[in-house]
């Protein structure tokens, strides 16, 4: 099964992101827009993993306090367009803890540098307009283990488990 570890977004954050997607579409941008229910922040991508239990065991060792996360700016990595996040030492620390827990158990994950973003559009065409994101923030209080399956109408993400914030 294809797995990743993510922060699931609040309704306020998803609403602001869908508003941005609609504005981009209205500006003539085309591509594969991320479905509202699939908007998330990836902390670590594992890819194909035969068993989710060792991953949940690794996540269960995490200790982190709830923290605030806010949207800030739009950008792109080639034809992948994303929403950015306000700089957050707590988010960076959480990503490091997640990746350390996986590495400690020799679980496979993409070791590219953590670059916090929320994917809005894949295979985007057009020019990135100078739109402003609606202000939105949320309290991060859990980390989720997610499974990714290909469905009839795109990817379907299912939460397999979550770890709540604790000090």
Regions of interest found by a model, annotated:
Residues 1-167:
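Histidine-dependent nucleotide/RNA phosphoesterase domain, centered on the 2H-phosphoesterase fold
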């Amino acid at each position: 099964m294809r797995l990743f570890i993510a922060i699931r977004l609040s309704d306020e954050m998803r609403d602001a992101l869908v508003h941005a997607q609609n504005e981009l579409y209205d500006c003539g941008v085309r591509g594969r827009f991320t479905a509202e229910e699939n908007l998330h922040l990836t902390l670590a991508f594992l890819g194909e993993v035969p068993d989710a239990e060792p991953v949940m065991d690794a996540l269960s060792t995490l200790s982190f306090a709830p923290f605030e996360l806010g949207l800030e700016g739009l950008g792109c990595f080639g034809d992948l367009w994303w929403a950015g996040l306000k700089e957050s030492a707590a988010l960076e620390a959480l990503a490091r803890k997640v990746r350390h827990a996986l590495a400690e158990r020799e679980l496979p994950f993409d070791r590219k540098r953590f670059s916090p973003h929320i994917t809005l559009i894949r295979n985007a065409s057009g020019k990135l307009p100078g739109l402003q994101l609606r202000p939105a923030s949320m309290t991060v209080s859990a980390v989720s283990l997610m499974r990714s399956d290909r469905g009839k109408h795109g990817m379907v993400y299912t939460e397999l488990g979550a770890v709540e914030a604790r000090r």
